[in-house]
């Protein structure tokens, strides 16, 4: 089955907006050292800048999904693009910590509907068998926005300064949102977003959360991306520069490695998900165990690591990030179209909830383990702080195993038996 005419143009415009959203989302990660000086804060304060953004993103997932079900993807994603641009403009001009928190909240709120809107457009425009691969392709292209943050944003920031860097991001965000407004639409036969009226918000939320397959999606999304997010969104550059003794250029290069690994992992994950739908949970578990091993090997050493080992570590974390999108594939499998937006939002909360927990844990442990007033941290302090990430990892692993058992029971009730590996 071929996609309708115009599908590629719509997909390109939507992905461009998601690409810019990822640049907005990750821009603070390359500015962590500068943010400590600009806002006169310490580790917990710096963590709060990232947490405010990610927590708002997570909190807005279900409302954004409900708006998506009612209004369609175009309106909500364009509104999101404009909000993010306003947030970056505020970041450009303020040196107030309180206003910076507000700016990051705007960015998180604007970012919230973008990916699930692109996923809805893909499901509407393309044949079902192509959807998992195209959603992973969306993630791959979006991850290149993280590459832009690691290289281009870092270059502008270090060359021209804080205000020009964030001002440029604001202008680009408005331009891309305007371009998407002209190109993004639903197929003519699907202009009415759903054939059935959307459920009320909390009816849809309860129905989504009550479905074991959706809970498996939530916990899969919770478990897999937070390690990469903690490194890319905030703590990677300070760790590489102050604890591992790397230059800012080398730290940016390590974030590039993380991003490229994610981009290479995305299409492979999409193909495996499409070809082996009954093995999706094993993909999640394999990724989680590999990521845990990478952390253990890094944190076991009490001295700075050679660049190649840091690069391998970043590659493993980056490759695990796109596995989180398997969670959204569970939502598509277990949710009717009338509440797919809410179900996708519910699942998408998982990874960003674990990211909030992870970023806060690292910041809190760093501040407790370091001398009062410290604004840079030692390797031993970072080792202790990163070890705290075992907590969300264990919670996520238990969640995946339990919800997988319940999901397989539901499948068995429908006559579908998952064979042993």
Regions found by a protein language model. Give the residues of each.
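Helix-to-loop junctions at the C-terminal end of transmembrane segments
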Residues: 60-72, 265-279
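Conserved MFS/SLC helix-loop-helix module at the cytosolic interface between two early adjacent transmembrane helices
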Residues: 59-98
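Extracytoplasmic gate region of multi-pass secondary transporters
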Residues: 28-29, 212-266, 358-363
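Helix-breaking motifs and short loop linkers at transmembrane-helix boundaries and internal kinks
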Residues: 40, 72, 93-99, 110, ...
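Helix-loop-helix hairpin linking two adjacent transmembrane segments in secondary transporters
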Residues: 137-186
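Cytoplasmic membrane-interface "Motif A"-like loop-to-helix N-cap segments
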Residues: 70-80, 274-289
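Cytoplasmic helix-loop-helix junction between adjacent transmembrane helices
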Residues: 103-142
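Juxtamembrane intracellular "pre-TM" segments in multi-pass secondary transporters
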Residues: 1-4, 186-218, 417-421
């Amino acid at each position: 089955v071929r996609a309708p005419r115009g599908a590629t143009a719509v997909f390109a415009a939507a992905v461009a907006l998601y690409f810019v959203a990822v640049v907005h989302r990750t821009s603070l990660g390359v500015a962590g050292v500068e943010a400590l000086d600009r806002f006169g804060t310490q580790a917990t304060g710096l963590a709060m800048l990232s947490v405010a953004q990610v927590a708002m993103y997570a909190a807005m997932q279900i409302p954004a999904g409900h708006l998506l079900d009612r209004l369609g993807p175009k309106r909500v994603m364009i509104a999101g693009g404009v909000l993010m641009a306003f947030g970056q403009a505020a970041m450009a001009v303020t040196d107030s910590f309180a206003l910076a928190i507000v700016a990051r909240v705007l960015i998180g709120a604007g970012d919230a509907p973008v990916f699930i809107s692109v996923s809805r457009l893909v499901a509407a425009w393309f044949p079902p068998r192509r959807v998992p691969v195209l959603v992973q392709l969306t993630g791959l292209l979006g991850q290149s926005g993280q590459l832009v943050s690691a290289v281009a944003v870092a270059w502008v920031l270090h060359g021209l300064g804080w205000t020009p860097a964030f001002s440029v991001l604001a202008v680009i965000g408005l331009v891309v949102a305007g371009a998407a407004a002209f190109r993004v639409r639903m197929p003519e036969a699907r202009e009415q977003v759903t054939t059935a009226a959307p459920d009320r918000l909390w009816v849809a939320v309860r129905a989504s959360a009550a479905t074991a397959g959706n809970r498996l999606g939530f916990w899969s999304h919770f478990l897999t991306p937070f390690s990469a997010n903690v490194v890319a969104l905030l703590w990677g550059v300070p760790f590489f520069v102050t604890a591992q003794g790397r230059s800012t250029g080398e730290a940016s290069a390590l974030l590039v490695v993380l991003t490229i690994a994610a981009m290479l992992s995305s299409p492979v994950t999409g193909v495996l998900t499409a070809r082996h739908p009954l093995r999706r949970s094993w993909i999640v578990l394999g990724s989680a165990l590999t990521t845990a091993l990478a952390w253990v090997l890094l944190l076991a050493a009490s001295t700075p690591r050679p660049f190649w080992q840091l690069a391998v570590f970043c590659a493993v974390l980056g490759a695990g990030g796109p596995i989180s999108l398997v969670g959204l594939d569970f939502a598509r499998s277990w949710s009717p179209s009338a509440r797919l937006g809410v179900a996708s939002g519910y699942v998408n909360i998982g990874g960003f909830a674990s990211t909030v927990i992870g970023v806060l844990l690292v910041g809190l442990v760093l501040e407790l383990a370091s001398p009062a007033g410290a604004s840079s941290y030692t390797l031993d302090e970072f080792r202790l702080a990163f070890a705290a990430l075992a907590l969300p990892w264990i919670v996520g692993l238990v969640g995946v195993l339990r919800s997988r058992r319940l999901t397989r029971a539901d499948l068995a009730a429908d006559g579908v038996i998952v064979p042993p590996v």
